[in-house]
Amino acid sequence: MTEPNPGPFALLCEDRRNHREGWLSQGFWALAVYRLSAPRLARRRGIVRTIWGIWTKLAGKWVEVRCGISLPETARIGRRLRIEHFGGIVVHGSSVIGDDCLLRQNVTLGNRSERRPLDAPTLGNRVQVGAGAVILGAVTIGDDAVIGANAVVLSDVPPGARAVGNPATIRMPTPRP
């Protein structure tokens, strides 16, 4: 997330362009609620923050129930996140997701233990997460990494590597001649 943040409405336009179905994409709906709710945390206490908070909480619950996508406003999500297929996507409130990442259906970014409830994954830029993948704990996924379908990641993944299997094994890309 190295690029400057242009603001919630510019980010919404980027997110809409990034999803093939645009306004009809459930992934876009979830990101729209996130983009509109996250700036509320920076506001001072007051009636506007309270009313906006109630609206965004209701909208967030609607997205969770209707689309099966949970993106808490406390998570830090970079630009142009693409949610390829909706359903079963859970992101921990302390997670960090870099720019140009891709999440597929049934992905979990969560903590590993009740004793460390704030430990959450950090995804670098351009990370692709396959369907059904689970990334748990305070792990860092490097830039351009690929997490395979149904992989269970419990340790750091270096930049450009692939993590596949349960538990995930790390495979470095083969150098090209």
Question: Which residues does each predicted region cover?
Answer:
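Terminal amphipathic alpha-helical/low-complexity segments used for targeting or macromolecular assembly
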Residues: M1-C67, R176-P177
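Left-handed beta-helix
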Residues: C67, P72-E73, G78-R79, E84-G93, ...
